[in-house]
Amino acid sequence: MDYKETLNLPQTNFQMKANLVQKEPNMLKYWEEKEIYKKTLETREGAPTYLLHDGPPYANGDIHLGTAMNKILKDFVTRYKTMRGYRVPYVPGWDTHGLPIEHRVTTTLGEEAKKKSPVEIRKLCKEFALKYVDIQREEFKRLGVKGDWEHPYITLTPDYEYHILDVFKTLVENGNVYRGNKPVYWCPTCRTALAEAEIEYHDHESPSIYVKFQMVDQPDTYVVIWTTTPWTIPANVAIALHPEYEYLKIKVGNEYWIVADGLLQKFASETGIEFQVTEKFLGKTLEGKLTKHPLYDRTSVIVLADYVTLEDGTGCVHTAPGHGEEDYQTGLKYNLPILSPVDDEGKFTKEAGKYEGLKIWDANKVVVEDLEKAGALIKFGKISHSYPHCWRCKGPVMFRATPQWFISVNKNNLRGKVLEQIKKVKWYPSWGENRITAMVQERPDWTISRQRVWGVPIPAVKCKSCDEVTLDPKVIEHFANIVKEKGTDAWFELDIKELIPSDFSCPKCGSKEFEKTYDTLDVWIDSGCSWEAVIRSKGEKFPVDLYLEGDDQHRGWFQSSIFLATAKTGNAPFKTVVTHGFIKDEQGRKMSKSLGNVIDPMEIVNKYGADILRLWVASTDFFDNIRVGKNIIEQQVEVYRKLRNTLRYLLSNLYDFTENDILPYEKLLPLDKWALGRLQKYIEQVTQYYEEFEYSKVYNATVKYCTTELSSIYLDILKDRLYVEAKDSIYRRSAQTVLYYILEALIKILAPIMPFTAEEAYQESPLKKYESVHLENWPEVRKEFINENLLEEFQQLLLVRDDVLKALENARSSDVIGHSLDAHVKIEPKNSEIGQLLEKYADMLEDFFIVSKVSILNELSDGINGQLVTVLVEHAEGQKCQRCWKYHPDTGKDENHPETCPRCSAVLRGERK
């Protein structure tokens, strides 16, 4: 007889081979057709809302691994919180104005760009941005990210632009916006001012020069300065000393030079001079003394400043208020001229005299030559240092004094209020709080004007009579209402008379004749107003629960958002902020095209499936920088296989089981009670990890649970009961009851991380109550299933099992047995407690060790010495049962089932229930 036909062999349509690349698009279609996202909101109508507000990616290219990881992490949060019973609306957004897009458009146009009107350029920028919104939307959807993809927020829409202007109006009303001629970061390539958040630091080689300035009242004495920007020497008007530092007058040849005591040795070693110290004095004694400018017929005054350090140079700081923030502040204090003889393209203007028309970087060489001719150059060298570059064109930037609009961070104690709000926010990781606090404490006023056309216009008007430039809340409000209908193109298309209220007049001279100005707002204001445009104005929960972005946003979106929200509402826009690190390659190097180590997330998705990419994201300690490469992804494929096989085992052994077959806890066998208790501990543990955004711990706990506790122990032990015992017997139903609970928990716990695979398993499972697993509720910890005493006993039994497995392996390698079912295991406990425990559970030990017979003896003459027991393995007596493969002395005694053991023959006779 073929006894295989009498076994309860596994059955399922859930295949071992995942075929994710083929299946996932069909799953997306299913979710869309069934409107699953919409139903997650409808089924939780009236429940508390959890709001994760999406930081908008920039719409100027395909998604990269960083943006993919960011969206996947957000999806972990929203799916988990939905299953916890919250109403979780998720509105994705895109940042669509600004220099990067305009730069791409004008670069593509080349010379043609100069022939285009602002409106034509803006139209092309809009088309470009919306094209990439559509591309990125499809890519994000393919990753399995759920949300309101048909109604995203896009910063170029009239409604959104209206709210930008509305927030801006509040800042103007409060007096936080002012116009000033201040040095700002300026990109000569892109020809615009840049904010701090638009600056990147890269290594850059600069000239390094020591220059001497002759004292007017002591012609043989010189003050020595050091600079890495010789091109700024034409704008020098002062030399700054620290009031409390000690300075030395040293004799070099026939001259006397002044340098700081703390930098003398370094200076002497770099210049190779021989010197003799002749005098010592504090910096403040030289305040107000005049020196001769080495290139022009004018003087440079000695001033005092606390920012002078003893790190580099001479302690005598070259000061050009038109080319540096600290220099500028010193210039204001001493009423110095603000010289900035450089135009938008980084070329010297006629104010620079002989240097007119030279680009500043080319001027470095000429200025150095002129200093040498004038006898003022002490030493020329080169230095490689970290230097500010433009985020868009990657070129070096300069500080340049130009008329710009600023937000004062100190007016109305805005900085102080923001610092107070930062303390109220929960930061993950916790060091995020210190980081943003330090940045806010040190940040300068915010340069908000851009000399570009692709952005929200600053509705400032210039009086034709007196040239006064005015930014008035009434004009902003009037323009904002036009924008609501027509968008910000209106500023470029409509006549000035339509753009301002009819009764508006110049506050300085009373004239009613104006012309437009054409600066646009910093794009960080656009995204920084999203809490108002997307959340607060729509009546959604404010402050929102969570912002989750890369840790570069401490100086970007987090900061722009908290400043603008605090200014308008008095509150931070978020309760919690989570940040992730940056993606590196397997060697820890930054990803770059030049290194050839860039990984396209869609390549991973198209080769392996989105669930593999998502599993990789879950595996990372994302709070820090994250490594990825081909080998790391391949490792996730292996892990995925193990998780999938666990699900397959569970599904394939529940094909004939429904909720009605569940046994009450008291009827379960001890091993099943242990497994059910362990399941509760696992649920409790991973739920806590999900709450704390510790997805790598969810991943590690789940992989360990599936591969160690389930596959290697519980599921392995169960095979005999599931396949061999009678279909409806307590032995099988007890096991199936726990498998049902495990499957239910595991599918739900995996659903936020692997939504496609969890859905596939759910659709094949006896659990299915809804159209989708993503409409299910989170598994609850059922305390009544936790018997601590039993769990402790099984902890001891598992240690005994380890001893037995080692002995079985030894017996296998010695050819005593082939399979563990060939074994008769004799056990001598090392103490009475273990002995009593083994006697208590004697009935289940054969299954527990997967052997044919177990004997507990007081003494063994031979055996393997283990941790808790001594184990002797012998070949089991009797014949091998052809149905269950166990050995038994009475196998073959049933005439109707001659090749079976007593247990199997009882099952076949229908007597074992």
Curated annotation (Swiss-Prot):
Catalytic activity: tRNA(Ile) + L-isoleucine + ATP = L-isoleucyl-tRNA(Ile) + AMP + diphosphate
NCBIfam families: ileS
Gene Ontology molecular-function annotations: aminoacyl-tRNA deacylase activity; ATP binding; isoleucine-tRNA ligase activity; tRNA binding; zinc ion binding
Quaternary structure (record): Monomer.
Domain remark from Swiss-Prot or TrEMBL: IleRS has two distinct active sites: one for aminoacylation and one for editing. The misactivated valine is translocated from the active site to the editing site, which sterically excludes the correctly activated isoleucine. The single editing site contains two valyl binding pockets, one specific for each substrate (Val-AMP or Val-tRNA(Ile)).
Domain of life of the native organism: Bacteria
Compartments where located: Cytoplasm
SUPFAM superfamilies, sorted: Anticodon-binding domain of a subclass of class I aminoacyl-tRNA synthetases (SSF47323), Nucleotidylyl transferase (SSF52374), ValRS/IleRS/LeuRS editing domain (SSF50677)
Function: Catalyzes the attachment of isoleucine to tRNA(Ile). As IleRS can inadvertently accommodate and process structurally similar amino acids such as valine, to avoid such errors it has two additional distinct tRNA(Ile)-dependent editing activities. One activity is designated as 'pretransfer' editing and involves the hydrolysis of activated Val-AMP. The other activity is designated 'posttransfer' editing and involves deacylation of mischarged Val-tRNA(Ile).
Binding of Zn(2+), residues: 881, 884, 901, 904
Family designation: Belongs to the class-I aminoacyl-tRNA synthetase family. IleS type 1 subfamily.
Cofactor(s) needed by this chain: Zn(2+)
Motif ('KMSKS' region): 590-594
EC number, UniProt record: 6.1.1.5
GO biological process, one term: isoleucyl-tRNA aminoacylation
GO cellular component, one term: cytosol
Cofactor binding remark: Binds 1 zinc ion per subunit.
Classification via Gene3D superfamilies: 1.10.730.20, HUPs, Ile-tRNA synthetase CP2 domain-like
Motif residue range(s): 'HIGH' region: 57-67
InterPro entries: aa-tRNA-synth_I_CS, aa-tRNA-synth_Ia, Anticodon_Ile_BEm, Ile-tRNA-ligase, Ile-tRNA-ligase_type1, Ile-tRNA_ligase, M/V/L/I-tRNA-synth_anticd-bd, Rossmann-like_a/b/a_fold
Protein name as annotated: Isoleucine--tRNA ligase
Binding site for ATP: 593
